[in-house]
């Protein structure tokens, strides 16, 4: 039986958990084995910029951060289950990658 590894990433953990719950309910309804969603470490991207563009005045900085949340789901890849997973509405903020394995 083939297995599918579904990798999900997003900057919004609420939308990410919503998609994970949809995949989980599909797996329960079709009766296939599923492992996950396994949370991976959150990546924090930081950018610090100077507020003053000309270099004059006091040194004040803006600090910007973006957090990227990731989840991994391993699921048995039978045709019916994969067809249902492909029909899920995925928000724009969520990136999905499906990898099939033997």
Curated annotation (Swiss-Prot):
Keywords: Ribonucleoprotein, Ribosomal protein. The gene is rps10. GO terms for biological process: translation. Pfam families: Ribosomal_S10. The keyword Ribosomal protein applies. Signal peptide: none annotated. Involved in the binding of tRNA to the ribosomes. HAMAP family: Ribosomal_uS10. GO terms for cellular component: small ribosomal subunit. This is Small ribosomal subunit protein uS10. Residues 34-61 are annotated as: Disordered. The keyword Transmembrane does not apply. It comes from the Archaea. Belongs to the universal ribosomal protein uS10 family. Part of the 30S ribosomal subunit. InterPro entries: Ribosomal_uS10, Ribosomal_uS10_CS, Ribosomal_uS10_dom, Ribosomal_uS10_dom_sf, Ribosomal_uS10_euk/arc. GO terms for molecular function: structural constituent of ribosome; tRNA binding.
């Amino acid at each position: 039986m083939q297995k599918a590894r579904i990798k999900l990433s997003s900057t919004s953990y609420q939308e990410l958990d919503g998609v994970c719950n949809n995949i989980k309910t599909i797996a329960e309804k079709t009766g296939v084995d599923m492992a996950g969603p396994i949370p991976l470490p959150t990546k924090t991207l930081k950018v610090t910029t100077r507020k003053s563009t000309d270099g004059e005045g006091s040194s004040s900085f803006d600090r910007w951060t973006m957090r990227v949340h990731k989840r991994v789901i391993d699921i048995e890849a039978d045709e019916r289950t994969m067809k249902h997973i492909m029909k899920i509405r995925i928000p724009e903020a969520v990136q999905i990658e499906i990898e099939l394995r033997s």
